[in-house]
């Protein structure tokens, strides 16, 4: 019997992720991304529920 090795063996322990040094700009950017994602999620939920996106009221035609 022959044994086959199908590529690189996985290590038993995963390497630890290195802690990144974040400056205030990176933190602000990530917060903005989270806020945008939350707003998009709320908008999608509003669209699925069938509610109007904006309160436009009665539509008026240009005719008299």
Curated annotation (Swiss-Prot):
InterPro entries: TMA7. One of its GO terms (biological process) is cytoplasmic translation. Interacts with the 40S ribosomal subunit. Residues 53-64 have a biased composition (Gly residues). Signal peptide: none annotated. Involved in protein synthesis. One of its GO terms (cellular component) is nucleus. This is Translation machinery-associated protein 7. It comes from the Eukaryota. Keywords: Cytoplasm, Nucleus, Protein biosynthesis. Belongs to the TMA7 family. It is found in: Cytoplasm; Nucleus. Residues 27-38 have a biased composition (Basic and acidic residues). Present with 3100 molecules/cell in log phase SD medium. Residues 1-38, 45-64 are annotated as: Disordered.
